[in-house]
Amino acid sequence: MRINPTTSGSGVSTLEKKNPGRVVQIIGPVLDVAFPPGKMPNIYNALVVQGRDSVGQPINVACEVQQLLGNNRVRAVAMSATDGLTRGMAVIDTGAPIRVPVGGATLGRIFNVLGEPVDNLGPVDTSTTSPIHRSAPAFIQLDTKLSIFETGIKVVDLLAPYRRGGKIGLFGGAGVGKTVLIMELINNIAKAHGGVSVFGGVGERTREGNDLYMEMKESGVINKENIAESKVALVYGQMNEPPGARMRVGLTALTMAEYFRDVNEQDVLLFIDNIFRFVQAGSEVSALLGRMPSAVGYQPTLSTEMGSLQERITSTKDGSITSIQAVYVPADDLTDPAPATTFAHLDATTVLSRGLAAKGIYPAVDPLDSTSTMLQPRIVGEEHYETAQRVKQTLQRYKELQDIIAILGLDELSEEDRLLVARARKIERFLSQPFFVAEVFTGSPGKYVGLAETIRGFQLILSGELDGLPEQAFYLVGTIDEATAKAMNLEMESNLKK
């Protein structure tokens, strides 16, 4: 699907004063604007409020039309703070949706929801812009090839592999490592695949956004010397911003990714952290617009809003967008309408477990809860499929035996079950892995493990060849060869202590 980009300025900066209105009501981030009869703006048109505040400073607030109220009035949601706005201020209808800069000039830069750079590196060197509201590619333009997207993370590649051009959800409560995993994926994909990424920071902490930017500069994903050589564009709408900005920043990031796919014909990675905040912002806007809430207080249009975003994230015959979305799970409840609605759109789910994080196993990916539509023998091959199934069976049996172990102890198990438990504990530890982006905290250098090496490692554990090694040798290592080397070091250390 081809975008028809224009060569006008970004955001809502180029204004023709052809359709002036007046602010008649302000309630928080929601404005009511009156227009002359017969000159009503369309839904999703960008409006700009212009004037001066009480101390004479100029005001330039962009809004998006959400409702046509009758009596020549519209209701709009502000994309920035409404401090200093007063009734009677002039409003300009731009005649089109918000437009944002697209193309190679966006790489290495940080933008807000309006496509304005916020990194103090000057204006963006492009005149090409695209509207943030577009229809999804037509059915005939979609590409249906099935191929694996290797990440270099053992637990992901073996048990819940990602589809190239698919949608992946990272599920987990607060503080279990979603953002760290996303940072690692950006790092691995930029280095191993040379791919272009777009990162949409939706309603998350400003500190995390800053940390991510600094980490990318250090790792070379953003090239400090030559910004044009960077591999990622960043779009932020953080926690402190109005709900309108948080609701639309995901579309801004997606629009930039679509240009790389449709015009540059590239394979793109779109990271959204956090898709729950997109739903949350929509819920806030829905309440501010006076809509009746639905289940658990969410907006009645939850499925429609989610669908309009997710259906644009797809593979076409020109290129692909592989999307990895962090999903905050409120109170760790997967049946909450926000994560439940997200599930319907995903090809793979990576579920992060608080229990594994408490054990110190990172990434804390739950090997039994995480799923992928790609884990089929006809797609990944018999060897990969069989190994993954045996790993899951071993871990499932270990999970079933844990109650017996807690009450009666390991000694009451049969010889066969004791052996299975020992292997399961080795597998559990071997699923951990040192990350490049966590080197500063762990002191261990990061590891990228290829899929063939991952399969070989787990086959050796399952076959019983490594039954004699201590389980701590498998903790936070890359390949199985590193585990055997670590076991030898542990043995030497224990001999020295004797």
Curated annotation (Swiss-Prot):
- Quaternary structure and partners: F-type ATPases have 2 components, CF(1) - the catalytic core - and CF(0) - the membrane proton channel. CF(1) has five subunits: alpha(3), beta(3), gamma(1), delta(1), epsilon(1). CF(0) has four main subunits: a(1), b(1), b'(1) and c(9-12).
Annotated SUPFAM superfamilies: C-terminal domain of alpha and beta subunits of F1 ATP synthase (SSF47917), N-terminal domain of alpha and beta subunits of F1 ATP synthase (SSF50615), P-loop containing nucleoside triphosphate hydrolases (SSF52540)
**The encoding gene:** atpB
Family of the protein in this entry: Belongs to the ATPase alpha/beta chains family.
* Membrane topology summary: Peripheral membrane protein
**Keywords from the named record:** ATP synthesis, ATP-binding, CF(1), Chloroplast, Hydrogen ion transport, Ion transport, Membrane, Nucleotide-binding, Plastid, Thylakoid, Translocase, Transport
**Where is it located?**
Plastid, Chloroplast thylakoid membrane
Q: Which residues bind ATP?
A: G172, G173, A174, G175, V176, G177, K178, T179
Q: Which reaction does it catalyse?
A: ATP + H2O + 4 H(+)(in) = ADP + phosphate + 5 H(+)(out)
GO molecular function terms attached to this record: ATP binding; ATP hydrolysis activity; proton-transporting ATP synthase activity, rotational mechanism
Pfam families referenced in this protein's UniProt entry, alphabetically: ATP-synt_ab (PF00006), ATP-synt_ab_N (PF02874), ATP-synt_VA_C (PF22919)
Q: What does this protein do?
A: Produces ATP from ADP in the presence of a proton gradient across the membrane. The catalytic sites are hosted primarily by the beta subunits.
- Membrane-spanning residues: none
Q: Give GO cellular component annotations, separated by semicolons.
A: chloroplast thylakoid membrane; mitochondrion; proton-transporting ATP synthase complex
Give the UniProt record's GO annotations in the biological process aspect: proton motive force-driven mitochondrial ATP synthesis
| EC assignment | 7.1.2.2
The record's section on SMART domains has: AAA
Q: Does the keyword Translocase apply?
A: yes
Output the HAMAP family linked to this UniProt entry: ATP_synth_beta_bact
- Classification of source organism: Eukaryota, Viridiplantae, Streptophyta, Embryophyta, Tracheophyta
Name of the protein: ATP synthase subunit beta, chloroplastic
